[in-house]
Amino acid sequence: MLAFQKALESGCDGIELDVQLTKDGEVVIIHDEYLDDLTDFTGNVRDYTLGELKSCNAGGKWQEVYGFQPIPTFEEYCEWASGNSLITNVEIKSSVYYYEELEKKTMELIERFGLKERIIISSFNHLSALSCKDFMPDMKTGALVENGGIANAGYYCKKFGFECYHPGVEGLTKEEVELCHKNGIEVNVWTINNMDDLENLYEWGCDGVITNYPDVCKSWLKAKKAKG
C-alpha cells in the first residue's frame, strides 16, 4: 500500500495494478504469478493462503529503505481508493493461470466500494476482461496487448466491446491511434519511461500513459500546456 500512497503523493492521475487469487480465494495485488523475484517467498501466489502471504515481505529491492511491506488485498486497496479521486486500471492476471471467480470477486469489491466510475478493467486475456461485463455491463474495459499491438485495433475493440486499447509503446503508430479514436476507443499506452516516447504520444493525442515516473511526466505535461 505504501507504493500507492507514494504514487498519490506524486500527483499522478491514476494507478495500474494487477490482481490474482490466493489459495483460499482472496483477491490480492501483486504483479508476478510467482513470488521469487519480488518477495522473500518462493513459488506461486496461488499456492499460498492469504494468511500465509501476509507474512511475506513484498518490499522487493526497497526493503532496506521501507522495511516490511505486506502484499495488499484488493479489498484494502478499494477502501483506500474510496478516499481519493484516482483512476484505477485493474489488470486481471489470468494469462498464465486461470483463476476461477477472480473476475466475479474483483467486480464485487468494486461495486461494494462504489468505485465503478473510476475503474478500467484490462487483461492480456481479453475474454477475461470482457467477462467482467457479465457482472457489470457498463464496466469500462481495455484490450491489453504486447509491444507490436494488434492489426486494426480500433475495429477490434469496437467489435468486441472494449472502450479502451492498451498497447505497449514499441511499434505503436500515429495511424493506429487515429483509427482507435475514429472508432471511439481511448488509447492508454504502457510503459512510458523516456521523454521522446512521451512527446510522440502527446502529439498523437493518446488519452493516457502508464509510467514508472508519474511526477516527471506530470511536470513535463504541465510545462507543455503552459507553452500552448
For each feature predicted by the language model, list its residue ranges.
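Phosphate-group recognition and catalysis centered on beta-loop-alpha active-site segments
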Residues: 1-228
